[in-house]
Amino acid sequence: MLLSTLGSTLAVNGVSIAAASTPPLFQRESLPQEFSKVISLGKLRILVLSGSPHKDGTTNLLATNFVKGAKEAGHEVRRVNTSFEDINACRGCFFCLKNSGQCLIRDDVPAILHLIEQADVVIFVTPIYYYAIHSSLKALLERFTSRRTDFMKMPKKMGLIAVCGGKFEWSFDSINAHFDSLSRYLGWKDIGRSEARGYPTKTDIQKTEYPKLAYQFGFNLS
């Protein structure tokens, strides 16, 4: 089979067919401002890391409800939508381990890691893609390498909100094992997980208790 392209036309063995249009690149979002250095007694600095590439989907709905609940409880909340930031995968060069945590890669990750350092609580929000967290969140986690020693010394809390369109009972087994290991490795306290399976669309999940549960998760943090 011989393939060739000319403009928006794809030729297969000399026969011209219309080529599928390339989807537009995602619009990069600005990162949120840093957390306040001083915060009211009993209130928390909460960083929400949301991995969905769909701004009007199930994952975004639950993330938004969580943020609303946390803010209404008086907490200081920052949110990063990792699919819309410049996040590259770790190269495994270990330059950072020999150079005081500085990474060779120039992207948004150092600024995001700084927000994580400032936060008391880190909430990961993700769709399930092939029984794993979204690739943008995974890439960010890999880049923890440059701060892992510092993170291990910080008594943080972490939580998880995950959504899966499939209905298998074991849909969350792999990511639960991952987050068990992550919590254990970093020494961060696991404060809870909200996992919804069998809801592929926003309309589906709006009919359930999960949006309310996400709100309560944020509101009841302490």
Predicted region positions:
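Short beta-strands and strand-loop turn motifs
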Residues: 49-50, 125, 160-164, 194-195
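Short glycine-rich anion-binding loops that position phosphate/pyrophosphate groups of nucleotides
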Residues: 128-130, 165-166
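N-terminal beta1-alpha1-beta2 submodule of the flavodoxin-like/Rossmannoid cofactor-binding fold
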Residues: 6-125, 131-147, 208-222
